[in-house]
Design a protein with these regions (language model features):
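RNA substrate-binding interface of SAM-dependent RNA methyltransferases
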Residues: 37-41, 107-200, 204
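Surface-exposed amphipathic alpha-helices with a cationic face
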Residues: 64, 182-186, 262
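Structured adenosyl-cofactor binding patch, chiefly the S-adenosyl-L-methionine
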Residues: 33, 160-166, 228-268
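Short, acidic/turn-prone active-site loops that include or flank metal/cofactor-
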Residues: 50-51, 76, 150-152, 218-220, ...
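N-terminal positively charged helical leader segments and presequences
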Residues: 1-108
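Short, glycine/polar-rich helix-capping loops at beta-to-alpha or helix-loop-helix junctions
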Residues: 55, 152-158, 220-229
Protein backbone atom coordinates (compact mmCIF):
# COMPACT_ATOMS: atom_id res chain seq x y z
CA UNK A 1 0.00 0.00 0.00
CA UNK A 2 1.15 3.55 -0.56
CA UNK A 3 2.58 5.59 2.26
CA UNK A 4 1.74 9.08 3.48
CA UNK A 5 3.84 12.11 3.87
CA UNK A 6 3.51 15.10 6.06
CA UNK A 7 7.06 16.48 5.87
CA UNK A 8 9.12 17.27 8.89
CA UNK A 9 12.04 19.62 8.92
CA UNK A 10 15.43 17.94 8.58
CA UNK A 11 16.88 16.98 11.95
CA UNK A 12 20.55 17.24 11.16
CA UNK A 13 23.33 18.31 8.84
CA UNK A 14 24.97 15.11 7.61
CA UNK A 15 28.24 17.02 7.31
CA UNK A 16 28.05 18.51 10.82
CA UNK A 17 31.20 19.08 12.82
CA UNK A 18 29.95 16.99 15.75
CA UNK A 19 28.16 13.96 14.30
CA UNK A 20 26.17 11.96 16.80
CA UNK A 21 24.44 8.61 16.81
CA UNK A 22 20.82 8.87 15.67
CA UNK A 23 17.88 6.50 15.75
CA UNK A 24 17.44 7.03 12.00
CA UNK A 25 21.01 5.98 11.23
CA UNK A 26 21.37 2.42 9.94
CA UNK A 27 24.84 0.91 9.56
CA UNK A 28 26.48 -2.30 8.40
CA UNK A 29 26.45 -3.86 4.95
CA UNK A 30 23.42 -6.11 5.35
CA UNK A 31 21.19 -3.63 7.22
CA UNK A 32 21.93 -0.85 4.72
CA UNK A 33 21.37 -3.22 1.80
CA UNK A 34 17.98 -4.23 3.18
CA UNK A 35 17.04 -0.61 3.87
CA UNK A 36 17.85 0.36 0.29
CA UNK A 37 15.90 -2.59 -1.06
CA UNK A 38 12.88 -1.90 1.13
CA UNK A 39 11.88 1.31 -0.61
CA UNK A 40 11.18 2.87 2.77
CA UNK A 41 13.21 5.94 1.88
CA UNK A 42 16.87 6.85 2.33
CA UNK A 43 18.28 10.38 2.47
CA UNK A 44 22.00 9.71 2.33
CA UNK A 45 24.37 6.74 2.13
CA UNK A 46 27.76 7.23 3.78
CA UNK A 47 30.68 5.16 2.50
CA UNK A 48 34.04 5.02 4.22
CA UNK A 49 37.04 6.34 2.36
CA UNK A 50 39.28 3.44 1.38
CA UNK A 51 36.39 1.02 0.91
CA UNK A 52 37.02 -1.66 -1.71
CA UNK A 53 36.02 -0.25 -5.14
CA UNK A 54 33.68 -3.13 -5.93
CA UNK A 55 31.82 -2.72 -2.63
CA UNK A 56 31.64 1.05 -3.06
CA UNK A 57 30.30 0.60 -6.60
CA UNK A 58 27.64 -1.82 -5.32
CA UNK A 59 26.31 0.57 -2.70
CA UNK A 60 26.59 3.57 -5.03
CA UNK A 61 24.44 1.81 -7.62
CA UNK A 62 21.87 0.79 -5.02
CA UNK A 63 21.78 4.29 -3.58
CA UNK A 64 21.18 5.82 -7.01
CA UNK A 65 18.32 3.40 -7.65
CA UNK A 66 16.80 4.38 -4.30
CA UNK A 67 17.18 8.11 -5.00
CA UNK A 68 19.73 8.63 -2.24
CA UNK A 69 22.84 10.81 -2.14
CA UNK A 70 26.23 9.12 -1.64
CA UNK A 71 28.94 10.75 0.46
CA UNK A 72 32.46 9.47 1.19
CA UNK A 73 33.58 10.04 4.77
CA UNK A 74 36.57 9.18 6.93
CA UNK A 75 36.18 5.89 8.84
CA UNK A 76 36.63 7.77 12.11
CA UNK A 77 33.60 9.90 11.29
CA UNK A 78 31.53 6.77 10.74
CA UNK A 79 32.76 5.46 14.09
CA UNK A 80 31.63 8.65 15.81
CA UNK A 81 28.26 8.64 14.07
CA UNK A 82 27.47 4.98 14.71
CA UNK A 83 29.15 4.67 18.10
CA UNK A 84 30.93 1.48 17.07
CA UNK A 85 33.91 0.17 15.12
CA UNK A 86 31.62 -2.44 13.52
CA UNK A 87 29.99 -0.16 10.94
CA UNK A 88 31.63 -2.12 8.05
CA UNK A 89 32.30 1.11 6.21
CA UNK A 90 28.70 1.93 5.34
CA UNK A 91 25.79 3.75 6.97
CA UNK A 92 22.55 5.33 5.77
CA UNK A 93 20.11 7.93 7.03
CA UNK A 94 16.47 6.94 6.66
CA UNK A 95 14.13 9.56 5.23
CA UNK A 96 12.70 11.95 7.78
CA UNK A 97 9.19 12.34 6.40
CA UNK A 98 5.90 10.54 6.55
CA UNK A 99 4.23 9.67 3.27
CA UNK A 100 0.55 9.74 2.42
CA UNK A 101 -1.46 7.37 0.24
CA UNK A 102 -2.80 8.26 -3.19
CA UNK A 103 -6.26 7.94 -1.66
CA UNK A 104 -5.32 10.67 0.82
CA UNK A 105 -4.44 12.99 -2.05
CA UNK A 106 -7.78 12.32 -3.73
CA UNK A 107 -9.56 12.86 -0.43
CA UNK A 108 -7.82 16.23 -0.02
CA UNK A 109 -9.19 17.33 -3.39
CA UNK A 110 -12.69 16.15 -2.45
CA UNK A 111 -12.52 18.01 0.86
CA UNK A 112 -11.85 21.23 -1.07
CA UNK A 113 -14.68 20.54 -3.50
CA UNK A 114 -12.23 20.46 -6.40
CA UNK A 115 -11.52 17.92 -9.14
CA UNK A 116 -8.27 16.08 -8.36
CA UNK A 117 -5.06 17.62 -9.66
CA UNK A 118 -1.99 15.41 -9.11
CA UNK A 119 1.59 15.31 -10.35
CA UNK A 120 3.38 11.98 -10.89
CA UNK A 121 7.13 11.48 -11.16
CA UNK A 122 8.17 8.73 -13.55
CA UNK A 123 11.80 8.67 -12.46
CA UNK A 124 12.87 12.27 -11.81
CA UNK A 125 16.35 11.69 -10.40
CA UNK A 126 17.77 15.10 -9.52
CA UNK A 127 16.62 16.20 -6.05
CA UNK A 128 16.84 19.85 -7.07
CA UNK A 129 14.47 19.18 -9.97
CA UNK A 130 12.05 17.28 -7.76
CA UNK A 131 12.06 20.11 -5.24
CA UNK A 132 11.42 22.68 -7.98
CA UNK A 133 8.55 20.56 -9.35
CA UNK A 134 7.03 20.40 -5.87
CA UNK A 135 7.23 24.17 -5.57
CA UNK A 136 5.45 24.70 -8.89
CA UNK A 137 2.89 22.01 -8.08
CA UNK A 138 1.95 23.69 -4.80
CA UNK A 139 1.76 27.18 -6.31
CA UNK A 140 -0.40 25.95 -9.19
CA UNK A 141 -2.92 24.25 -6.94
CA UNK A 142 -1.99 20.58 -7.16
CA UNK A 143 -3.34 18.40 -4.37
CA UNK A 144 -0.19 16.31 -4.14
CA UNK A 145 2.66 14.59 -5.90
CA UNK A 146 3.29 10.88 -6.40
CA UNK A 147 6.84 9.49 -6.58
CA UNK A 148 8.17 5.95 -7.08
CA UNK A 149 9.74 4.00 -4.23
CA UNK A 150 12.58 2.99 -6.55
CA UNK A 151 14.04 4.54 -9.68
CA UNK A 152 13.75 8.20 -8.71
CA UNK A 153 14.54 10.80 -6.09
CA UNK A 154 12.83 10.50 -2.73
CA UNK A 155 12.06 13.49 -0.53
CA UNK A 156 15.44 14.23 1.02
CA UNK A 157 16.64 17.37 2.83
CA UNK A 158 18.00 18.58 -0.54
CA UNK A 159 14.55 18.19 -2.09
CA UNK A 160 12.94 19.97 0.85
CA UNK A 161 15.39 22.86 0.56
CA UNK A 162 14.98 23.08 -3.23
CA UNK A 163 11.20 23.23 -2.83
CA UNK A 164 11.57 26.57 -1.01
CA UNK A 165 9.09 25.54 1.66
CA UNK A 166 6.61 23.76 -0.61
CA UNK A 167 7.51 20.38 0.88
CA UNK A 168 6.03 21.55 4.17
CA UNK A 169 2.60 21.91 2.57
CA UNK A 170 2.34 19.53 -0.39
CA UNK A 171 1.36 15.92 0.40
CA UNK A 172 3.55 13.30 -1.24
CA UNK A 173 2.60 9.69 -1.87
CA UNK A 174 5.25 7.11 -2.67
CA UNK A 175 4.18 4.04 -4.62
CA UNK A 176 5.74 0.77 -5.72
CA UNK A 177 4.51 1.01 -9.30
CA UNK A 178 3.70 4.22 -11.18
CA UNK A 179 1.97 2.28 -13.95
CA UNK A 180 -0.39 0.57 -11.54
CA UNK A 181 -1.09 3.91 -9.87
CA UNK A 182 -2.06 5.37 -13.24
CA UNK A 183 -4.46 2.49 -13.81
CA UNK A 184 -6.06 3.07 -10.41
CA UNK A 185 -6.40 6.80 -11.02
CA UNK A 186 -8.07 6.19 -14.38
CA UNK A 187 -10.53 3.80 -12.74
CA UNK A 188 -11.50 6.67 -10.43
CA UNK A 189 -12.15 9.04 -13.30
CA UNK A 190 -8.84 10.89 -13.35
CA UNK A 191 -7.61 11.81 -16.83
CA UNK A 192 -3.86 11.16 -17.00
CA UNK A 193 -1.56 13.19 -19.24
CA UNK A 194 2.18 12.86 -19.71
CA UNK A 195 4.63 15.38 -21.10
CA UNK A 196 6.53 14.28 -24.20
CA UNK A 197 7.94 15.86 -27.34
CA UNK A 198 5.59 14.02 -29.72
CA UNK A 199 2.39 15.08 -27.96
CA UNK A 200 -0.40 17.55 -28.71
CA UNK A 201 0.47 21.24 -28.20
CA UNK A 202 -0.27 22.12 -24.59
CA UNK A 203 -3.01 24.71 -25.12
CA UNK A 204 -4.98 22.45 -27.46
CA UNK A 205 -5.80 20.13 -24.54
CA UNK A 206 -8.73 20.41 -22.14
CA UNK A 207 -7.06 20.37 -18.74
CA UNK A 208 -10.00 21.37 -16.56
CA UNK A 209 -11.32 18.13 -15.05
CA UNK A 210 -9.82 15.52 -12.74
CA UNK A 211 -6.25 15.39 -13.97
CA UNK A 212 -2.83 13.90 -13.29
CA UNK A 213 0.35 15.02 -15.02
CA UNK A 214 3.20 12.53 -15.43
CA UNK A 215 6.74 13.91 -15.74
CA UNK A 216 9.58 11.68 -16.89
CA UNK A 217 13.24 11.42 -15.97
CA UNK A 218 15.83 13.98 -16.99
CA UNK A 219 17.59 11.63 -19.39
CA UNK A 220 14.97 9.47 -21.07
CA UNK A 221 11.68 11.17 -20.27
CA UNK A 222 8.48 9.23 -19.66
CA UNK A 223 8.91 5.47 -20.12
CA UNK A 224 7.13 3.85 -23.05
CA UNK A 225 5.03 1.68 -20.74
CA UNK A 226 3.80 4.67 -18.77
CA UNK A 227 3.21 6.66 -21.94
CA UNK A 228 0.95 3.93 -23.31
CA UNK A 229 -1.11 4.00 -20.13
CA UNK A 230 -1.75 7.74 -20.32
CA UNK A 231 -4.95 9.18 -21.78
CA UNK A 232 -3.12 11.99 -23.52
CA UNK A 233 0.31 13.42 -24.28
CA UNK A 234 1.11 17.13 -24.16
CA UNK A 235 4.08 18.92 -25.63
CA UNK A 236 5.68 22.32 -25.35
CA UNK A 237 6.52 24.03 -28.63
CA UNK A 238 9.89 25.76 -28.78
CA UNK A 239 11.00 28.76 -30.82
CA UNK A 240 14.66 27.79 -31.11
CA UNK A 241 15.32 25.41 -33.99
CA UNK A 242 18.58 23.89 -35.18
CA UNK A 243 20.49 24.96 -32.09
CA UNK A 244 21.02 21.54 -30.56
CA UNK A 245 19.00 22.65 -27.55
CA UNK A 246 15.89 20.57 -28.06
CA UNK A 247 14.12 20.27 -24.71
CA UNK A 248 13.20 22.08 -21.52
CA UNK A 249 14.58 21.04 -18.17
CA UNK A 250 11.96 18.87 -16.47
CA UNK A 251 11.32 21.37 -13.69
CA UNK A 252 10.93 24.21 -16.19
CA UNK A 253 8.57 22.14 -18.33
CA UNK A 254 6.61 21.24 -15.22
CA UNK A 255 6.20 24.89 -14.26
CA UNK A 256 4.88 25.83 -17.70
CA UNK A 257 2.43 22.93 -17.93
CA UNK A 258 1.22 23.25 -14.35
CA UNK A 259 0.55 26.95 -14.83
CA UNK A 260 -1.52 26.21 -17.93
CA UNK A 261 -3.51 23.62 -15.98
CA UNK A 262 -4.08 26.15 -13.20
CA UNK A 263 -5.21 28.79 -15.71
CA UNK A 264 -7.68 26.47 -17.42
CA UNK A 265 -9.07 25.25 -14.11
CA UNK A 266 -9.59 28.89 -13.08
CA UNK A 267 -11.50 29.54 -16.31
CA UNK A 268 -8.90 31.92 -17.73
Amino acid sequence: MDEQKMPRRPRRDHDGEQPQKSESLVYGKNPVTELLKSGSGVDTVLLAEGMAPAVAAYFTAMAKEAGATVKRVHPNKLRLMTGTESHQGVAAFASEIEYASVEDLLAAAKAKGEPPFLVLSDGIEDPHNLGAVMRSALLCGAHGIVIPKRGGASVTPTVIKSSAGAAEHLPVARVANIGETIRRLKEQGVFVYCADMDGVPLRKNNLTGPIALVLGSEGSGVSQLVKKLCDGVVRLDMAAQGTGVDSFNVSVAAGIILYEIQSQRAGE
